[in-house]
Amino acid sequence: MLQDYSLIIIPILTAVGTQVLKLGFDHIKGNLDLKHMWDSYGGMPSSHGAFVACLATMVGYAAGWTSAAFAVSLVFAIITIRDAVGFRREIGVHGKILNRLVKEHPAAQSHTYPVLAERWGHTPTEIVVGSIIGILVGIIAQVL
C-alpha cells in the first residue's frame, strides 16, 4: 500500500528533511529561527529543488524515462527551479534594498512601513545541493 503513495510521500518527506537541514545550516550561521522552517523561502539547501528533483526521479523510475508522466514532472521541476533562482530571488533582493532605503530615508521616520521579507528564492548553489539531495533520495527510494 505504501508503494501506491510513495510518489508523493517520499518527495514530501524529502522536502521536510531539507527544511530540517536548513535549520541546521541556520544554526551554524548563528541565525536559528524555527519560523524559517515554515514561513521562509530561501536558504541552504533548497527544499523546493529537493522536492521536485525527488519527484521527477521517482516518476522516471516508476513510469519510465520516456513517459509523459516523467516529461510533466521534469517540466514542473524546471519551472519550479527557474522560479526559485530567478523571480523569487529577485523579490528578496528588492525587499532588502527597499528595507534599507526606508530605514535610511529621513521622511520615512514620520511614517511606519512594514518590513519586507528578504529571504526569498535561492542561489544556484542552494538549488544544486537541494536537487542533488532530491535525486539521491529518489534513487535510494526506488532501489530499496
Regions found by a protein language model. Give the residues of each.
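Helix-loop-helix hairpins and the membrane-proximal interhelical loops
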Residues: M1-V20, I28-N31
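Membrane-embedded catalytic cores of phosphoryl/pyrophosphoryl-handling enzymes
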Residues: V16-V20, D33-L144
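Hydrophobic residues in alpha-helical segments
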Residues: H27-I28, G60
